[in-house]
Amino acid sequence: PETYYTALGSLKNLHIKPEDKILVRAATSGVGLAFARLAKAQFPDVHIVGSVRSGSKQFLLKHQAYDDIVIDQDGRLETEEQFDKILELVGPLTIKDSFDHIAPGGIICVTGLLGGQWELESFNPIEEIKNNSFMTTFHSAQVNQELMDELFDYIDRYQVDVSPRRVFSLEEVPEAHAYIEGKTGFGKVVIINENKKEKYDEKD
């Protein structure tokens, strides 16, 4: 449940409002998809835009709680839009560009490091952080039981679909890695033993 735990912690830190326009950078990531599902379940009228590096997954994203997509070309969004809230999953590599797209009074929550860069370089907070905008973070290394309980209650109350994208058996671990790392990779997968996988497939 760590993926949804991280997504819920980020959602709470962003203080979502029903009228918000939200950007999720790295929309096809597991946390990105979980966040979009959680947000739409409680706030069905929010407008969620996901950033992707190509438009090939647009159809899939629009069936996973996203309203629109924007192309992220080499760490820069190909849009002039501004957003009330931004979930930053790429990390320090794109934070400066995210601040170029935050609306007055907006919040950026830095949760991921998918860009492979761990630290901010040449970052002047007075210049980079817009007036009346905010940056926060969420880190799931220290699990809080109260938040974990809140997660399961949230999923039950809002009937959130938490099913994984794909299910693999133990023997299919190489295929699972290939799927996640390939161009068709999308969201999270689950590895289970063969007997349980057969029961899972029967339910579908």
Q: PLM features: residue spans?
A:
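Short acidic active-site motifs
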Residues: 74-78, 93-97, 147, 172-175
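Mid-domain Rossmann-like dinucleotide-binding core that forms the NAD(H)/NADP(H) cofactor-binding site
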Residues: 1-73
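A short acidic, Gly/Pro-enriched loop at the edge of an enzyme's catalytic core
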Residues: 78-86
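Non-catalytic, hydrophobic alpha-helical segments
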Residues: 7, 151, 173-176, 191
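N-terminal Rossmann-like NAD(P) cofactor-binding module of classical short-chain dehydrogenase/reductase
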Residues: 86-87, 109
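C-terminal capping/lid region of NAD(P)-dependent oxidoreductase domains
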Residues: 157-166, 175-204
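Short conserved AdoMet
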Residues: 17, 43, 103, 130, ...
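Glycine-rich phosphate-binding loop and adjacent beta-alpha segment
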Residues: 61, 93-160, 193-202
